[in-house]
Amino acid sequence: MLKSAVRSAFYTELTATEDAYFTPVEQPFRSPSCSISASDVYPAMLRLVALLAALCAVTQGCPTILTKSQWGGRAPTCRTAMATPVTYVVIHHTEGTACSTQSACITQAKNIQNYHINSNGWCDIGYNFLVGEDGNAYEGRGWTSVGAHAPNYNSNSIGISVFGSFMNYNPNTAAQNAVKNLISCGVSRGYIKSAYILKGHRNVTATDCPGNTFYNTVRTWPRFQA
């Protein structure tokens, strides 16, 4: 929808600018005189540049992020604000069932949130975001709330967990791209430092998370530090 709106605005602006340049004068047989000043055209060109930048951001920016209200998550019982931009991004797997459709991922998100609140006694789902093999991201605590996913790092990190257990295989390409795009999105929006440090969960506490195979892949990503 957003892409369509930007394209529509772009072509409307383009048409207006073309008209400004190419509409013939009313009396074509007289000596031509241009009635268009730079002050008429220049603002239109600036708007075109802005629209092109917006279209580029939509095309290359954030993955689809379902807000907590969109996936039907419970409201948190408490919240601690997190100072941004954060230094660390910590990658997890849920060590549960993978999902490749939005409906299946929503079911998993609700199950995990219920477990974290009801069994762990936490305020909310522990992760800042979750990612499915449907290529979507699912908001957990979001960009500006301290998570409960990595001891000693929670207050200065974004925790991203992929639905599934990845000891013996990787998440699919859609999920991996969504994780990478989510990180880039956080950087571009000012929530993650451009010089962030990427870690696997096992780098900050004793665990096999995010699974052996996926961890070996994450190690090859930019800005990884064990």
What are these model-derived regions, one by one?
Residues 120-123, 133:
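Glycine-/small-residue-enriched capping loops at alpha/beta junctions
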Residues 46-50, 58-96, 132-226:
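Basic/polar, cationic surfaces and motifs that engage anionic cell-wall
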Residues 6, 14-16:
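Intrinsically disordered, low-complexity segments enriched in serine/proline and basic residues
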Residues 83-117:
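Active-site acidic/histidine clusters and adjacent loop/turn architecture
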Residues 1-4, 30-52:
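Classical eukaryotic N-terminal signal peptides for Sec-dependent ER targeting/secretion
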